[in-house]
């Protein structure tokens, strides 16, 4: 005859009975406290790199009295990451088509022309050329 529902013992799933669990936790807590004091190295907080500071600087150059919300900054950061990835991928494909192992400014410029539409591509190319020229002259 099968046991009644009230008579069934709850399955512990291979764990210790509930009565002994607090004592084990205390011991484990003491061990971790001792280990944290000097045995193991603490992990630092992982840094997440964003374009937030650069976006903020550009915003202040264009509109000094305007602020930006955290959500808007997050959206702009995602946008910059997306465009960067698209340009890098396209430049990589162009270098592979031309059997080159190095991505140069020429591949970047061509990929920008392919990805961005019309007038936006022209402005991006001119600003990029200006930035590269400024960098080259200051590096000498």
From Swiss-Prot:
It comes from the Eukaryota. Residues 1-10 have a biased composition (Basic and acidic residues). It is found in: Nucleus; Chromosome. GO terms for molecular function: DNA binding; protein heterodimerization activity; structural constituent of chromatin. There is a cross-link at residue 134 (Glycyl lysine isopeptide (Lys-Gly) (interchain with G-Cter in ubiquitin)). Its main location: nucleus. Residues 11-21 have a biased composition (Low complexity). The keyword Membrane does not apply. There is a cross-link at residues 8-9, 25-26 (Glycyl lysine isopeptide (Lys-Gly) (interchain with G-Cter in SUMO)). InterPro entries: Histone-fold, Histone_H2A/H2B/H3, Histone_H2B, HISTONE_H2B_site. One of its GO terms (cellular component) is nucleosome. Keywords: Acetylation, Chromosome, DNA-binding, Isopeptide bond, Nucleosome core, Nucleus, Ubl conjugation. CDD domains: HFD_H2B (cd22910). The nucleosome is a histone octamer containing two molecules each of H2A, H2B, H3 and H4 assembled in one H3-H4 heterotetramer and two H2A-H2B heterodimers. The octamer wraps approximately 147 bp of DNA. Core component of nucleosome. Nucleosomes wrap and compact DNA into chromatin, limiting DNA accessibility to the cellular machineries which require DNA as a template. Histones thereby play a central role in transcription regulation, DNA repair, DNA replication and chromosomal stability. DNA accessibility is regulated via a complex set of post-translational modifications of histones, also called histone code, and nucleosome remodeling. This is Histone H2B. The lineage of its organism: Eukaryota, Fungi, Dikarya, Ascomycota, Pezizomycotina. The gene is htb1.
């Amino acid at each position: 005859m099968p046991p009644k529902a009230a008579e069934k013992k709850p399955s512990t799933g291979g764990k210790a009975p509930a009565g002994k669990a607090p004592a084990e936790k205390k011991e484990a807590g003491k061990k971790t406290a001792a280990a944290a004091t000097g045995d193991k190295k603490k992990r630092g907080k992982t840094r997440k790199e964003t374009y937030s500071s650069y976006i903020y600087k550009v915003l202040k150059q264009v509109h000094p009295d305007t602020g930006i919300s955290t959500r808007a900054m997050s959206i702009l950061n995602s946008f910059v990451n997306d465009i960067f990835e698209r340009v890098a991928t396209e430049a990589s494909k162009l270098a592979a088509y031309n059997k080159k192992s190095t991505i140069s400014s020429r591949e970047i410029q061509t990929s920008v022309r392919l990805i961005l539409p019309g007038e936006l591509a022209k402005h991006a190319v001119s600003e990029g050329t200006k930035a590269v020229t400024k960098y080259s002259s200051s590096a000498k």
